[in-house]
Curated annotation (Swiss-Prot):
Signal peptide: none annotated. Belongs to the DNA gyrase inhibitor YacG family. Binds 1 zinc ion. This is DNA gyrase inhibitor YacG. GO terms for biological process: regulation of DNA-templated transcription. Its cofactor is Zn(2+). GO terms for molecular function: DNA topoisomerase type II (double strand cut, ATP-hydrolyzing) inhibitor activity; zinc ion binding. Inhibits all the catalytic activities of DNA gyrase by preventing its interaction with DNA. Acts by binding directly to the C-terminal domain of GyrB, which probably disrupts DNA binding by the gyrase.
């Protein structure tokens, strides 16, 4: 892919909707900045975003299983 093609590829920052050039030199892509990247991470931590799917139940652990070996 040529450099001119790479510089034309733009996406919107998921946080602030600013146009962002998609190229390897942009360390924050698809975000425009570290700030927008951290805002998005905070949204995941706060439970604002979820990934749909089925929850798997884990097997019960009894006391003897928890003993140090």
């Amino acid at each position: 892919m040529t450099e001119s093609r790479q510089t034309r590829l733009q996406v919107k920052c998921p946080t602030c909707q600013t146009a962002v050039v998609w190229k390897p030199e942009n360390a924050f892509r698809p975000f425009c900045s570290q700030r927008c990247k951290l805002i998005d991470l905070g949204g995941w931590a706060d439970g604002k975003y979820t990934v749909s799917g089925q929850t798997e139940s884990l097997p019960e652990i009894s006391e003897p299983d928890m003993a140090y070996r």
